Amino acid sequence: MLKLMRMAVVVSAAASISLAAGVSGNYIEARTADVFTGPCFANGEVEMNGKEAVFGWKITGGSWQGVSLEGLSVVGVIRSVHTLGNVYEPVNPVRAVLIVDSRADAEQRLALQSFARHMGGTLLGDIVQVDYAPIELTIQDGNIHGGAAKLTAGSLAAIQTRAMQATDHTCGNEEVWYPPLTELDHAMPAYALADSYQGDGLGETWSNGPRRSGFLGTFHVASE
């Protein structure tokens, strides 16, 4: 019995160490094209819309490269040459702006940038500007399935979403046409009531919505 108890303590401690060696949290995304749609709408938008996106992560627990990021957020804003997710344009140059939570200290700011580059991959491979602003990401009742969420990154970027509704089905054969821009444990399409970017890093600004262009999700990733 004592041996079993000791084993349980060891397993529990190992699990705690494993969890602490990474970060987990919530994610939000909105683009300038529908992501939940049917072929009739998707084909009409491809290469016309969907070249811009705002997305953000809020870390609810854990550390990255040994630095605690709990409660902090980071936002990516991108502009691409082709529609994001267009499989017929596998080479798609992207310029990006990173918005780092201004509440973070110097060490945390560097860790947030590293985390975002890891999660964003090639989408954040050409970051032309890094800004700092207070970031808030709230998901109503902490439930991504409810669909109601809001992201603000100072006055630079914002997203507001609600749940998808039956009236949002236009063709009747809608599906998740484009996957989220980052790897997630779980994701739900959401209706973006509004999303915007008002910064000066990409040479243009936009204010978009309402449209079926959002995602909410959760993530857990091991630290580098």
Q: Language-model segments: what does each one mean?
A:
Residues M1-R6:
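Positively charged n-region of N-terminal signal peptides that target proteins for export
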Residues M7-S16:
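Bacterial N-terminal signal peptides
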Residues A21-V100:
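N-terminal Sec/ER secretory leader and immediately downstream segment
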Residues I99-V221:
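Mature, soluble, non-transmembrane domains
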